[in-house]
Amino acid sequence: MKKAILITGTPGTGKTVISDLLKQNGFPTIEVGKLVKEEELYEYFDEVTESYVVNDNLLNKRLIDLIENNTSNYPLILDGHVVELPPNFVLHCIVLRCSIQHLRQRLSERSYGEAKIDENVEAEIMEIILTDMLELYGPERVCVVQSDISVEETFAQVLVEVKKVLND
């Protein structure tokens, strides 16, 4: 069965930057947030949180289809914070984390509103994504990479994790 590697974390932790580097190194990647918008895999746009409310059923069906039809020798890399695939489709999950200071700065640079910044900072403090991934996939398939360091160093650590999983 074909599987995916998830690159996840609170918005602003570096998922897309790292996934783009993986793509440049030959890994097939999907930016899940972009896919949701382009293929309208959402219920509606929430003005308060300034985000799309994802239709999980539609998204999972589409992601499973993409995983099953992946023709690469590598597993599909899924970049996003809304991915909760059935465990049998997930090879490994890399959760990117960063300090609150860095997160606030990165989200401010994206021109996020204060409410959205606060919501994401709270999610990072409460370890919501890490907790969800551990519950879904178990500690043997989840690892954490700190992204407060340079992009190059973060990418190097993620690449080590990906290669470790591929060699198992």
Walk through the language-model features, giving the residues of each:
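Hydrophobic anchor at the beta1->P-loop junction of P-loop NTPases
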Residues: 7
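A glycine- and Lys/Arg-enriched "phosphate-lid" helix/loop adjacent to the NTP-binding pocket
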Residues: 44, 97-144
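Pre-Walker A (Motif I) flank of P-loop NTPase domains
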Residues: 1-4
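NTP-dependent small-molecule kinase module
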Residues: 73, 104-112, 134-168
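ATP-binding Walker
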Residues: 13
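P-loop (Walker A) phosphate-binding loop of NTP-binding proteins
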Residues: 10, 22
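Walker A/P-loop
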Residues: 16
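ATP-dependent small-molecule kinase phosphotransfer cores
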Residues: 27-86
